[in-house]
Amino acid sequence: MAQSVKTMVEGGKATTGPPIGPALGPLGLNVAQVVKEINEKTKEFQGMQVPVTVTVIDPETKKYEITVGVPPTSALLKKELGLEKGASKKKEAVAGNATLEQIKNVAIKKMPSMLAKDLKSAVLEVLGTCVAMGINVEGKDPKEVQKLIKSGQIKIEQ
């Protein structure tokens, strides 16, 4: 039976210490080799927490598979906009201002793990996160941008 270890690691900076080392040790894997592979697969997400799953396919041969998830939408937005954090009181403060192009970039990165069937739906989902984080889009409230997209006044091209 395949055993799995799921954890969150900082992109490109996993170590043999907790949480990975103690979780993989009992499975008999070469922890240093697994960590090296995780860092290689997550380097594009540096500075962000990334979900990682290590599945031992065959305990006899120690064959394993590493699956890297997509960081949370909020982490992708913070990286795209160079923000430390979102606004703590979104009604009073604006954490940042994004372009529609930046929102599309985040949506494209996030789409594999979203339920959205097309880019337009993914962009609307990312705009929802912008609302929660206090991020304006093109100087407007993200809810307003969502309405403009739904009404067809703003077109989202693939």
From Swiss-Prot:
Q: Which domain of life is it from?
A: Archaea
Signal sequence, renumbered to the chain? none
Q: Please give one Gene Ontology molecular function term for this protein.
A: structural constituent of ribosome
Q: Which InterPro entries match?
A: Ribosomal_uL11, Ribosomal_uL11_C, Ribosomal_uL11_C_sf, Ribosomal_uL11_N, Ribosomal_uL11_N_sf
Q: Where is this region: Disordered?
A: 1-21
Q: Which SUPFAM superfamilies match?
A: Ribosomal L11/L12e N-terminal domain, Ribosomal protein L11, C-terminal domain
Which Pfam families does the UniProt record give? Ribosomal_L11, Ribosomal_L11_N
Keyword vocabulary terms for this entry: Ribonucleoprotein, Ribosomal protein, RNA-binding, rRNA-binding
Q: Name one GO cellular component term.
A: large ribosomal subunit
Keyword Ribonucleoprotein among record annotations? yes
Q: List the GO biological process terms.
A: translation
Answer yes or no on keyword Glycosyltransferase. Answer: no
Tell me which PANTHER family the record gives: 60S RIBOSOMAL PROTEIN L12, LARGE RIBOSOMAL SUBUNIT PROTEIN UL11M
Q: Which family does it belong to?
A: Belongs to the universal ribosomal protein uL11 family.
Cited function? Forms part of the ribosomal stalk which helps the ribosome interact with GTP-bound translation factors.
User: How would you summarize the oligomeric state and partners of this protein?
Assistant: Part of the ribosomal stalk of the 50S ribosomal subunit. Interacts with L10 and the large rRNA to form the base of the stalk. L10 forms an elongated spine to which L12 dimers bind in a sequential fashion forming a multimeric L10(L12)X complex.
Q: Which HAMAP family match?
A: Ribosomal_uL11
Protein's name in the database: Large ribosomal subunit protein uL11
- Name the gene: rpl11
